[in-house]
């Protein structure tokens, strides 16, 4: 029995031993003492898969670890890092030395100078990335290795390594980056790793080491490549306690004096190149060209098509190094597919056959070029500026003919001093402007602008855009389909907009000091013409416009012209519509009520080289120059719901933002606005100044009526409800315009009716002339004429003729406008007598006066009968009598008065000429860290052994136990 008990005891001991062995295989735990020092070594000589046993150190605040890498061709270099004092995590440094493994080069800055290190890799890592560099004391693991293309570049802390493509300033951190901070100790002050001059394929990373970095989540790569999102590389900061230690973080910096691109997937090349290994980028690899503060050419070498993805620059605008690097032998810049997010200046002519985009905040300055061609997409969300730095230059040829020309930012060209005509051609497949396009072209010889059909919800501004010599000029659209204008078009400094095809929408055309020429007025719909100064609205008599064209600010000084003989002119005082008739065609303009019907007249002249009839007004200027048409809404929709009645239809404003029939309620109710988008502008109409809403969101009045206020414009002749909005909502005030007329010009005009007779009969025409500017004293006198009837008899009989002679000049002191004297002259000849009216121009004067002139020459007629052998003939002899004095009164027409309408609206622009700082853009690619599995290879083998023991060994042990028990 005792023997059996001994056997049973031995069997139980065997079972317990087996169970202990199985438990060891099934658990993956290891017990590591706190505050221990662990050394980890790995080899990487030619190894594709490296098995390394890396023990997990418990997280404590004072752990110092040393990581040593042994390579095939260099001595061991190890360094230990002082513990971090500012973080509970342990900051460690990975020291690297030796030669490149599998062609990958990771740039590592070490606390101590690593001499002759042309390429360094992180210890604990291999080219295959199968093992991970573990930060001692950190909970972050599994960081993938850094794999870069094989260019020999390295940076020693505090010094420039021979053969390096760029020198990193030790201790400097990238501008705008989340700077690598030294914690606890300063390791040679190196806080940035530079990878430059290399073309990245697959992935790239740089590891900062040699400094104790605590809490920093970025490695600053000055002029280095950011990791491609699909690559496995990462920017890892050794000693970082951040879980983002595997993140790919790229930031532009100021190291080496260059600013790098922050665009993901771009390769930034520094000011110098290494053995030509990085001078060109292979097709399909995106690269960037930085605008460097240094004078070195950026990305010197060949830039092949399709390799350029972005052009950036530092915040401080530098010289056009990009243009040098992109220039051809003839000085022309051939721009590949490009996105511009910084401040770039290209000097010289530019040809772009691939898409070019200026991102929001980006700025592209085209300087001193004679020719610009954009034959692919041209997208402008930022700003494009055409500028000249020379005192003399020829006019620019600018051609945009790609598929899309989309402007939501600013396009501005300034070249008024050009010695030859500027020529801008905007003929893309799709032309959409929601921003601001402004062209100030050649002044000496007016510039030409050609447009394809456009969609405009922003602003066009043209100065000096016209052709001389009477040909069709200005902004011309040559296409079958029409344009849509829901914004503003401003014409000044003699600019003429020739509208050949249909224009629709609800926009405004402001004639500031230019002209608008409509060839087909019936297809010019929904637009409001606003006179803001002197100019002409001209219409071709090709068709009758069924809807009157709304015209704001017509005074007669700014004229309406018809390029055909006008046979009748009428004004409806009830509707405010002025109608000109030419044959069977009629042309009507809604100029507003308040004009005098007797003040209108027609005069002849020329416009754009063609004979034209001007519709003039010489009466009192209407107190309201607003059109009565309801088709004057501009820029935005005015909507009402329910049966709301409106007491004032406020239409046709002078606001620079938008014009139109802004609807206001007839009841003085308080408007409640929800989340308004508001800004106000001050409108000046004659002497009435009002602050009105330019933009206000959906509004509900006290009666429950919901409508949208977009622009409210006061009418000077009616009581209008003007709504203003601020942070507290929308409010109602009432303003009544009181100005009837205001003379703002010293110019005056004299109108004379002239009757001209010829073989076809007599025609009566009205001639209007401009009086000279007022002077204080002018000595002059009108010419006067005396008419005498003379009867002349000869062998053929007697004829009566009328002789008109000029009276001598008289002298008087007067200030008067130009005047005219009309005399009726009867002329008789062999065919009979005809009566003609002769009108002559009086000298200048500026006020009404009565003048005393010397008497005109007069004649005495005597009848003489002469007889000879043939008989008697009766002849009449006329002789001059002495001069007498007479009084001639010259009365000038009363000068015209005008009302000037000015407005000054505030203009909100969200994207103008903002300069993008390259350091402000940070692209981050991160992936979550996974817990470390220790002894990974052993676990796989252990689980295999345990699986076998589970079935076989356990059965054998049970059998031994039974035998021992029964024996």
Curated annotation (Swiss-Prot):
Q: Repeat sequence: residue ranges?
A: 93-105, 106-118, 119-131, 132-144, 153-165, 166-178, 179-191, 192-204, 205-217, 218-230, 234-247, 248-259, 266-278, 745-780, 781-815, 816-854, 855-893, 894-902
Q: Which biotechnological use is given in the entry?
A: Probable mannoprotein called haze protective factor from wine that is able to prevent visible wine protein haze formation. This mannoprotein showed haze-protective activity against wine proteins and BSA when either was heated in white wine.
Q: Where do we find GPI-anchor amidated alanine lipid attachment?
A: 946
Position of the signal peptide: 1-23
Q: Where is this region: 13 X approximate repeats, Ser-rich?
A: 93-278
Q: Which domain of life is it from?
A: Eukaryota
* Residue span(s) of the pro-peptide: 947-967
Q: How does it sit in the membrane?
A: Lipid-anchor; GPI-anchor
Secreted as UniProt keyword: yes
Q: Where in the cell is it found?
A: Secreted, Cell wall; Membrane
Q: InterPro entries, alphabetically?
A: Hyphal-reg_cell_wall_N, NELF-A_domain
User: Could you give one GO CC term from the UniProt record?
Assistant: cell periphery
User: According to its UniProt record, how is this protein modified after translation?
Assistant: The GPI-anchor is attached to the protein in the endoplasmic reticulum and serves to target the protein to the cell surface. There, the glucosamine-inositol phospholipid moiety is cleaved off and the GPI-modified mannoprotein is covalently attached via its lipidless GPI glycan remnant to the 1,6-beta-glucan of the outer cell wall layer.
Glycosylated residue positions: 28, 35, 493, 601, 638
Question: What is one GO biological process annotated to this record?
Answer: fungal-type cell wall organization
Q: Where is this region: 4.5 X approximate tandem repeats, Thr-rich?
A: 745-902
Region: Disordered, residue numbers: 72-301, 836-857
| UniProt keywords, alphabetically | Cell wall, Cell wall biogenesis/degradation, Glycoprotein, GPI-anchor, Lipoprotein, Membrane, Repeat, Secreted, Signal
Q: Which PANTHER family match?
A: NEGATIVE ELONGATION FACTOR A (PTHR13328:SF4), NEGATIVE ELONGATION FACTOR A NELF-A (PTHR13328)
User: What biological function has been recorded for the protein in this entry?
Assistant: Involved in cell wall organization and biosynthesis.
Q: Which family does it belong to?
A: Belongs to the SRP1/TIP1 family.
Free-text domain note: The number of the intragenic tandem repeats varies between different S.cerevisiae strains.
Q: What is this protein called?
A: Haze protective factor 1
């Amino acid at each position: 029995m005792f023997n059996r008990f001994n056997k049973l005891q031995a069997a139980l001991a065997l079972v317990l031993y087996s169970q202990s062995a199985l438990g060891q295989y099934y658990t993956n735990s290891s017990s590591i003492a706190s505050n221990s020092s662990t050394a980890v070594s790995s080899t990487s000589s030619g190894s594709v898969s490296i098995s390394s046993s890396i023990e997990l150190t418990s997280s404590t605040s004072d752990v110092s670890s040393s990581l040593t890498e042994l390579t095939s061709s260099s001595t061991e270099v190890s360094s230990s890092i002082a513990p971090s004092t500012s973080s509970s995590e342990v900051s460690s440094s990975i020291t690297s030395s030796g030669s490149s493994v599998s062609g990958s080069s990771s740039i590592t800055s070490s606390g101590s100078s690593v001499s002759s290190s042309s390429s360094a890799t992180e210890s604990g890592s291999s080219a295959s990335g199968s093992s991970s560099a573990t930060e001692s004391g950190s909970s972050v693991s599994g960081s993938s290795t850094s794999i870069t293309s094989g260019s020999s570049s390295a940076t020693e802390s505090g010094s420039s390594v021979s053969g390096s493509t760029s020198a990193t300033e030790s201790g400097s951190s990238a501008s705008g980056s989340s700077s690598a901070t030294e914690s606890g100790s300063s390791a040679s002050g190196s806080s940035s790793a530079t990878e430059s001059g290399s073309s990245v394929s697959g992935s790239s990373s740089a590891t900062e080491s040699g400094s104790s970095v605590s809490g920093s989540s970025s490695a600053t790569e000055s002029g280095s490549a950011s990791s491609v999102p699909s690559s496995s590389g990462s920017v890892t900061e050794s000693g970082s306690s951040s879980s983002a230690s595997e993140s790919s973080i790229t930031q532009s910096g100021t190291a080496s004096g260059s600013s790098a691109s922050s665009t993901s997937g771009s390769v930034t090349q520094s000011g110098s190149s290494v053995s030509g290994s990085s001078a060109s980028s292979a097709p399909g690899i995106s690269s960037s060209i930085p605008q460097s503060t240094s004078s070195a050419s950026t990305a010197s070498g060949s830039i092949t098509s399709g390799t350029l993805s972005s052009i950036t620059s530092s915040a401080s605008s530098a010289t056009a190094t990009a243009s040098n690097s992109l220039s051809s032998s003839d000085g022309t810049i051939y721009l590949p597919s490009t996105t511009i997010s910084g401040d770039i200046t290209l000097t010289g002519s530019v040809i772009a056959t691939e898409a070019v985009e200026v991102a929001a905040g980006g700025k592209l300055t085209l300087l001193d070029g004679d020719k610009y061609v954009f034959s692919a997409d041209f997208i402008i969300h930022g700003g494009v500026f055409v500028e000249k730095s020379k005192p003399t230059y020829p006019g620019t040829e600018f051609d945009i003919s790609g598929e899309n020309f989309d402007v939501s930012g600013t396009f501005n060209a300034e070249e008024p001093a050009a010695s030859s005509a500027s020529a801008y051609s905007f003929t893309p497949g799709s032309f959409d402007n929601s921003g601001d396009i402004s062209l100030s072209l050649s002044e000496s010889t007016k510039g030409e602008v050609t447009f394809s059909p456009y969609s405009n919800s922003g602003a066009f501004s043209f100065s000096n855009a016209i052709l001389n010599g009477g040909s069709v000029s200005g902004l011309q659209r040559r296409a079958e389909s029409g344009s849509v204008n829901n914004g503003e078009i401003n014409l000044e400094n003699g600019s003429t907009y020739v509208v050949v095809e249909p224009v629709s929408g609800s926009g405004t055309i402001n004639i500031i000091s230019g002209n608008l020429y409509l060839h087909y007025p019936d297809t010019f719909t929904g637009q409001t013409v606003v006179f803001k100064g002197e100019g002409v609205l001209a219409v071709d008599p090709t068709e009758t416009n069924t809807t009157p064209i709304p015209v704001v600010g017509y005074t007669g000084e700014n004229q309406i012209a018809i390029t055909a003989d006008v046979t009748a002119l009428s004004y409806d005082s009830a509707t405010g519509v002025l109608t000109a008739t030419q044959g069977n065609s009629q042309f009507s303009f809604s100029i507003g009520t308040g004009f005098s019907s007797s003040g209108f007249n027609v005069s002849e002249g020329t416009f754009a080289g063609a004979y034209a009839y001007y519709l003039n007004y010489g009466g009192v200027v209407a107190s309201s120059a607003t059109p009565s048409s309801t088709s004057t809404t501009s820029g935005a929709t005015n909507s009402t719901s329910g049966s709301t009645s409106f007491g004032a239809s406020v239409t046709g404003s002078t606001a620079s933002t938008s014009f139109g029939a802004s609807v206001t309620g007839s009841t003085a109710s308080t408007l409640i606005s929800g989340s308004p988008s508001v800004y106000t502008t001050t409108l000046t109409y004659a002497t009435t100044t009002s602050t009105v809403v330019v933009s206000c969101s959906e509004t509900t009045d006290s009666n429950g009526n919901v409508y949208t206020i977009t622009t409210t414009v006061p009418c000077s002749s009616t009581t209008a409800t003007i709504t203003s909005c601020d942070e507290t909502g929308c409010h109602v005030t009432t303003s009544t315009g009181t100005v009837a007329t205001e003379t703002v010009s010293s110019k005056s005009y004299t109108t004379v009716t002239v009757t001209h007779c010829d073989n076809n009969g007599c025609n009566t025409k009205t001639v209007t002339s401009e009086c000279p500017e007022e002077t204080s004293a002018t000595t002059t006198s009108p010419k006067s004429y005396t008419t005498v009837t003379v009867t002349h008899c000869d062998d053929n009989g007697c004829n009566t003729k009328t002789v008109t002679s000029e009276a001598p000049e008289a002298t008087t002191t007067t200030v008067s406008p130009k005047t005219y004297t009309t005399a009726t002259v009867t002329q008789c000849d062999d065919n009979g007598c005809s009566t003609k009216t002769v009108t002559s121009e009086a000298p200048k004067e500026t006020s009404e006066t009565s003048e005393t002139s010397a008497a005109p020459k007069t004649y005495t007629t005597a009848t003489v009968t002469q007889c000879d052998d043939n008989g008697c003939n009766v002849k009449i002899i006329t002789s001059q009598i002495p001069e007498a004095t007479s009084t001639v009164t010259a009365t000038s027409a009363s000068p015209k008065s005008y009302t000037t309408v000015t407005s000054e609206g505030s203009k909100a622009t969200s994207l103008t000429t903002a300069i993008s700082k390259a350091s402000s853009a940070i692209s981050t690619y991160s992936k979550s860290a996974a817990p470390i599995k220790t002894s990974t290879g052993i676990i796989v083998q252990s689980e295999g052994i345990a699986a076998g023991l589970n079935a076989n060994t356990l059965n054998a042990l049970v059998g031994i136990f039974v035998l021992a028990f029964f024996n």
